[in-house]
Regions:
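Residue-level detector of alpha-helical secondary structure
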Residues: 15, 27, 54-57, 61, ...
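Residue-level detector of family-conserved "landmark" positions at structurally sensitive sites
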Residues: 24, 40, 70-71
Length: 86
């Protein structure tokens, strides 16, 4: 499973349970599952993590999977509570 698919599935689970996750928690899960940034470094909950969320959202929209894209948009949040996909 690639990073985008992992994000999609995690977002689906979060939405099914009525919860969300902040970017730092997501970075920890990505690292724990062995995923790396495009620069082959661990995720830190910064720019690389936000880029992955946004890229996953765009990939799902372009694939016509709008429900999945909406899940990604709503599931992951910045520390201030705003949505991380923007």
């Amino acid at each position: 499973m690639d990073k985008r698919e992992y994000i999609r599935r995690l977002a689906e689970f979060l939405m099914s349970t009525g919860t969300s996750m902040n970017v730092q928690e997501l970075a920890g899960l990505l690292n724990w599952n062995g995923f790396k940034t495009n620069y082959d470094s661990p995720f830190k909950g910064g720019r690389g993590t936000y880029t992955l969320i946004h890229a996953t959202y765009d990939w799902l929209v372009s694939s016509g999977k709008t429900t999945d894209a909406d899940n990604v948009a709503l599931a992951f949040k910045k520390p201030n509570g705003t949505y991380a996909y923007k």
